[in-house]
């Protein structure tokens, strides 16, 4: 549903999607660093709780590594053009730094003494998934909407009480109100630990 919401599509067959790489842990039911191929396009989805202008450079290293895995190295020396999936880079951002609903980070912003058009570019589309942002996206992906509601409650309660208590209060309240209820019930302790870790990291 997240892919369909982002791309305004209606894919229903999971076999159409080929997972390429999974790294890091599952946080709040959303996989970090998820790479997959759909319709000859390669998508890299990442979740960030802090603003990071270096994402294009990170993704450059990542996509080069993925292409090396996908391509037969011997074919690079042939006269036949080696086709590769077109890359798409999406970051789901829910940090406290204020940004617009949709923005772009460009690799060329990191180039020193750039003159003229860059000879190499990589663009990361950053989608703000905090509560109150990207209403259309949230409407088409209920899990993302509920995740934003949960994060907003953690931040709200953390302003008035110790973080540990704030997270537990937010989890219990969301379960009562049917917000990510099944996931939070099944993974309560892990969610509390990871939420405290993520919030502390956000404040660094």
Predicted region positions:
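Elongated, amphipathic alpha-helical interaction scaffolds
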Residues: 1-204
